[in-house]
Amino acid sequence: MNKKRIITMGTAGLCMLMLTGCGGKDRKTYDQAVADLEQGSYDYALEGYKSSITAGYKSAESYRGAGIASLHLGNYQDAIDYLTSGLNDEKAGKTLKKDMLAYRATAELKSELFDAAMADCQTIAEDYAMDADTYYLTGCVALAMDSYDEASSNFTDAYDADTSYEMAIEIYEAYLEKDMEADGTRYLETALKTEAKTADDYCDRGKAYYYMQDYSNAKKELTEAVNKKSTEGILLLGMVYKAQGDTANARAMYQQYIETEGSSPAKGYNGLALCDIDDGNYDNALADITNGLADASTEEMQDLLYNEVVVYEKKLDFATALSKIQEYLKMFPDDENASKELIFLQSRNGG
């Protein structure tokens, strides 16, 4: 499932926000919320930030944190409301306001409130210094509004400001969501002209070749990444093998990822489930999904639960598939593909 990247503005700010002015219970609650947010425990982070808001402790920062947590949980209107409250907080400084504007624009983009998202992007451009992330965000909003020239201009500025493999891949993925891969491929090609230095570089190069369906070079780069101890490289190698229809080697990579990753194996189990689906081993796929859900983040849970629906469809158990997609949409109501799937399953169940 393709999901738009959540813009991670001001990641250094998370560390800065750990500095607190006084001790006691309120400080501990706030600090724990910050830690939970960094670790991807968004439900816990949200509860902590809500407690901080109620206590009036670091209110602007707490509204920001609650907004980000809600954004990751898929509660986009809640995210907008929290971030708006933070922006209206008289204690919010200029840097924090820019950060919250960017997150609010992201939530508005995901809610398809494109005019509001673009208005926030324009406020950032008028009142603050633009950077690679804000150019990228503006490009995503423009692309969603079918303003292709404006999107291209902002993506070019984003890549000029940050010529990393990661930025090139993110721009490509934005175009991929609009079925405009050709427009994004040039960024991948440009990035691949630079020399890899680190494990992350080799991993990103492998991902770029994977998107370009150059699986031979993808395996070469990812093997080098794995040799440099990249666990993500193992996962991506599994994706490359699966794309080639080699589920045996894909399965071996996903199993290696699970064993290497240890505390966060959900993506590996999801990969195993996809291999089992391809091989027609549907009960095994359900077992893999169950194992993955035990330690899944919100984003990982979304993939696993959606694939669970797919498995029940493959088993021709449309009643269970319908029940599962209804549960899924309660958690992720903005997933358009799932909404279409609901209509299909209702038709198969006489709805």
Protein language model regions, located:
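C-terminal motif of bacterial Sec signal peptides marking the signal peptidase cleavage site
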Residues: M18-G21
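Start-of-helix register in tetratricopeptide repeats
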Residues: R27-K28, E61, T95-D99, D133, ...
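Canonical tetratricopeptide repeat
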Residues: G65, H72, L96-Y103, Y136-L137, ...
